[in-house]
Regions:
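C-terminal catalytic "cap/lid" subdomain
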Residues: 1-170, 174-199
Length: 199
């Protein structure tokens, strides 16, 4: 299942699947996108920490920035959970009582998520910016964000393409950049072609 996700299929809980893989838990899955016996999942050796295993582009990702009193930001994150809007890559900051958060919401199952977030903030003391023209590209690999060479390569490829990314963040399983939607495929191809072991 994780391999399917690394190759672009939408996986709703990649962290849980990665946990199962690392702890020897057997998962069984069947594909619903084609006729036949379903997807055969085979055992592969762990690719190693710090090695890129895939590059993905996500057109269902929607970057958002919110600003306001800390209490509003806290309430906002609680509301996201109760509204069923999935989010990731949240970065919070606070200064002199004012707070802000940058995050990415998943619009696959909540296509109106951006509008719902903007509506929620319209009645508060804060502000909300929904970046509808941005999507995300991710270099996938356990511990990949700890590799300075990967950050450098990702930045160099963006520069060579003339693409400006307003945000690049690392997580336990990838390095994600916000990319203008019309350049997403170019970035995914360039990263894939230049990463050792993928190109």
């Amino acid at each position: 299942v994780l391999e399917m996700g690394l190759r672009g299929a939408k996986v709703l809980a990649p962290e849980a699947i990665d946990y199962a893989r690392r702890h020897g838990i057997t998962l069984h899955a069947r594909a619903s996108f084609t006729e036949g016996r379903g997807t055969v999942i085979t055992h592969r050796p762990h690719p190693g920490v710090g090695r890129a295993v895939a590059v993905t582009g996500d057109r269902t990702a929607l970057p958002i920035t919110v600003r306001g009193p800390r209490s509003d930001i806290d309430t906002f994150f609680e509301w996201l959970g109760s509204a069923g809007i999935r989010w990731k890559d949240a970065r919070r900051a606070e200064s002199d009582g004012a707070a802000s958060a940058e995050l990415v919401i998943d619009t696959l199952n909540t296509p109106d998520g951006g509008e719902r977030v903007a509506d929620w903030w319209s009645g508060s003391k804060g502000s909300c910016t929904v970046y509808t023209s941005l999507k995300t590209a991710t270099i996938v690999g356990e511990g990949i964000a700890e590799q300075a060479a990967v950050w450098q390569l990702a930045s160099e490829r963006l520069t060579s393409l003339g693409v400006v990314s307003p945000s690049m963040v690392g997580s336990a399983w990838g390095l994600t950049a916000q990319i203008p939607e019309d350049r997403l495929d170019d970035v995914v191809r360039a990263w894939h072609a230049h990463l050792p072991g993928l190109g």
